[in-house]
C-alpha cells in the first residue's frame, strides 16, 4: 500500500492557511509557513510551494522556497518579519501574482504583491497594494488575502479588512505597476 502525506501539516513543514489553485495540469498549494516549536504564527521567513498532478493528487511534490521576507523592502534585520497567509492569481498577461500580508515588529503592516513567470518559481517583489489616491493601503490589519481573476478583473478580498478590487492591476500602461487600488465598497463588501 502506498503511503500518502498531507502537505499542509507534514512532519517537517507546517503550511497552514492553505490556498489550493489549479494552474495547467497541476494543483498548487500556497500558505503560511509556521516554525516547529514556534511561539507565534508565521515565524518562518519565507513561503514554500507544493504541487501535485491533477490526475494523482496524492503525489505531492515539495517545490522549495518561492519567496523570502528579505525580498520585501520593509524587511528589518533582527525584527519579526512575518509573512501572513498568501494567495496567488494568474493575470491575463500569463504571470503569477503572489499577494501577501507582511507585518511584525518591523512596524510594517500592509498587503504587498510579488510576481513570477511560473506558479512556484522565484517571486520578485512588485509593490504595495494602494488606495485610489496612491497611498499605501494599511488602514486595517492586513491578512489572509484571496484573489481571483474575474474575466480580466483581478479581485482582491482579505480578512480583517474591507474588500478590494484590483481592476487592471497587472496590465501594462495601467498607470500603476505597484499593486492595486482599493475600490469603494458598501458595508456588505460589494462594489
List each model region and its residues.
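Carbohydrate-active catalytic/glycan-binding domains of CAZyme proteins
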Residues: 1-191
Amino acid at each position: 500500500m502506498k503511503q500518502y502525506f498531507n502537505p499542509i501539516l507534514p512532519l517537517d513543514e507546517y503550511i497552514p492557511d492553505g490556498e489550493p489553485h489549479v494552474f495547467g495540469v497541476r494543483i498548487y498549494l500556497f500558505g503560511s509557513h509556521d516554525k516547529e516549536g514556534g511561539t507565534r504564527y508565521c515565524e518562518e521567513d519565507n513561503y514554500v510551494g507544493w504541487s501535485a498532478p491533477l490526475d494523482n493528487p496524492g503525489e505531492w511534490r515539495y517545490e522549495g522556497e518561492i519567496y523570502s521576507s528579505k525580498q520585501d523592502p520593509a524587511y528589518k534585520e533582527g525584527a519579526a518579519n512575518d509573512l501572513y497567509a498568501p494567495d496567488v492569481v494568474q493575470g491575463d498577461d500569463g504571470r503569477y501574482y503572489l499577494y501577501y500580508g507582511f507585518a511584525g515588529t518591523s512596524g510594517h503592516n500592509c498587503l504587498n504583491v510579488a510576481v513570477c513567470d511560473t506558479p512556484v518559481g522565484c517571486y520578485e517583489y512588485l509593490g504595495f497594494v494602494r488606495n485610489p489616491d496612491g497611498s499605501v493601503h494599511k488602514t486595517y490589519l492586513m491578512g489572509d488575502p484571496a484573489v481571483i481573476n474575474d474575466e480580466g478583473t483581478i479581485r482582491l478580498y482579505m480578512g480583517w479588512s474591507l474588500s478590494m478590487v484590483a481592476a487592471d492591476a497587472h496590465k501594462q500602461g495601467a498607470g500603476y505597476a505597484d499593486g492595486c487600488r482599493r475600490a469603494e465598497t458598501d458595508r456588505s463588501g460589494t462594489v
